[in-house]
UniProtKB/Swiss-Prot annotation:
Ca(2+) 5 binds at D325, N327, D329, E336. Gene3D superfamilies: EF-hand. Glycans are attached at N33. Its main location: Golgi. It comes from Xenopus laevis. Ca(2+) 4 binds at D289, N291, D293, E300. It is found in: Golgi apparatus lumen. One of its GO terms (cellular component) is endoplasmic reticulum. Transmembrane segments: none annotated. Keywords: Calcium, Glycoprotein, Golgi apparatus, Metal-binding, Repeat, Signal. The gene is sdf4. This is 45 kDa calcium-binding protein. PANTHER family: 45 KDA CALCIUM-BINDING PROTEIN (PTHR10827:SF98), RETICULOCALBIN (PTHR10827).
Length: 360
């Protein structure tokens, strides 16, 4: 006969088991999303690539400055190699890359005199910049379809907002329902700040007369401000706003070279800081400050940022030649370009001198 103590112990164990089962049932029976904006599973968020398609990129190929005001470290390679930039990497076979570079040299050397002049380099830079422009146009067609599912050729701010939040892992259907019913959206502070900035940019891209809708061309300007004079001005204002410390809507040298917030105090960080200051000081004094009065205005920065400015392209051509022009004849030979390949391609093609004559 079972003792009273054993019976009570068995009853207690059964109770705990049932309680555990009920708790599990409660968890799995709950809605997958208590609030309309609760983040979905990591797998789903990771698989969602829409964010890269619908967010304006920080980096713009062929533009001298990033959206955050940093100098574009790959600008020289982008305007010299165009779409072939990705083919030149550190792991590529040097002999193959030398041949690629020689083929590019032949294309730039329009008069076939075995030398590249400033005017030839200028023409080439404009062609490569146009190549980047066309690439952005082609990509925009795909990105626009992602935010225009009904295919009516126009996208409202709310439609874009839904897609943006979905790209962040929020439930798209529930967000759409909340917006439709004018219900509050519970969004974290960081995401809301991004949305506010995007909204300002959205309405700037809405060409007059404003209808709060973006067509495909306006959406291109939204993603790529370098394609629109009006959006280029907006981009310049944003950069000056972030760098201008005294609120005069102009940039002094000290404002332009100010170190990024949160600099780490160690030797490696100090070396990075030194590079930052040196590069920005050189660019400010030699290029951006066109009249060399020690002040950069919005107009000067706008001209500097314009990738289709032929005068800028000529200046860039002269600078690129000066870097590798060892004999100071204001022209570039194939040997000089190969020797300074790291500047033009981002890859150092080793043993160029030993191989150049036997290959070319």
């Amino acid at each position: 006969m079972v003792s009273k103590q054993a019976f009570l112990f068995s009853l207690g164990s059964l109770y705990l088991s049932l309680l555990f089962i009920f708790l599990l049932m409660d968890v799995y029976a709950r809605p997958a999303n208590n609030s309309a904006l609760k983040v979905e599973t990591k797998e789903k968020a990771t698989d969602n690539k829409d964010e890269n398609e619908i967010l304006p990129p920080d980096h713009l190929n062929g533009v001298k400055m990033e959206m955050d005001g940093h100098l574009n470290k790959e600008f020289h390679q982008e305007v010299f190699l165009g779409k072939e930039l990705e083919e030149f990497d550190e792991d590529s076979e040097p002999r193959r890359n030398r041949r690629k570079l020689a083929a590019i040299f032949a294309k730039v050397d329009r008069n076939e005199d075995k030398q590249i002049s400033a005017s030839e380099m200028q023409r080439w830079i404009m062609e490569k910049t146009e190549e980047h422009f066309q690439e952005a146009v082609n990509e925009n067609k795909l990105h626009f379809r992602a935010v225009d599912p009904d295919g009516d050729g126009h996208v409202s701010w709310d439609e874009y907002k839904i897609k943006f939040l979905a790209s962040k892992g929020f439930n798209e259907k529930e967000v759409a329902e909340k917006l439709k019913n004018n219900e509050d959206l519970k969004i974290d502070e960081e995401t809301q700040e991004v949305l506010d900035n995007l909204k300002d940019r959205w309405f700037q891209a809405d060409n007059p007369p404003p209808d709060q809708l973006l067509n495909e061309e306006e959406f291109l300007s939204f993603l790529h401000p370098e394609h629109s004079r009006g959006m280029l001005k907006f981009m310049v204002k944003e950069i000056i706003r972030d760098l201008d410390q005294d609120g005069d809507k102009k940039l002094t040298l000290s404002e332009f070279i100010s170190l990024p917030v949160g600099t780490v105090e160690n030797q490696q960080a100090q070396d990075i800081d030194d590079d930052w200051v040196r590069d920005r000081k050189k660019e400010y004094e030699e290029v951006i400050d066109a009249n060399h009065d020690g002040i950069v205005t919005m107009e000067e920065l706008e001209e500097y940022m314009d990738p289709m400015n032929e005068y800028n392209a000529l200046n860039e051509a002269k600078q690129m030649i000066a870097v590798a022009d060892e004999n100071q004849d204001h022209l570039l030979s194939l040997e000089e370009i190969l020797k300074y390949s790291e500047y033009f391609t981002g890859s150092k093609l080793m043993d160029y001198a030993r191989n150049v004559h036997e290959e070319f």
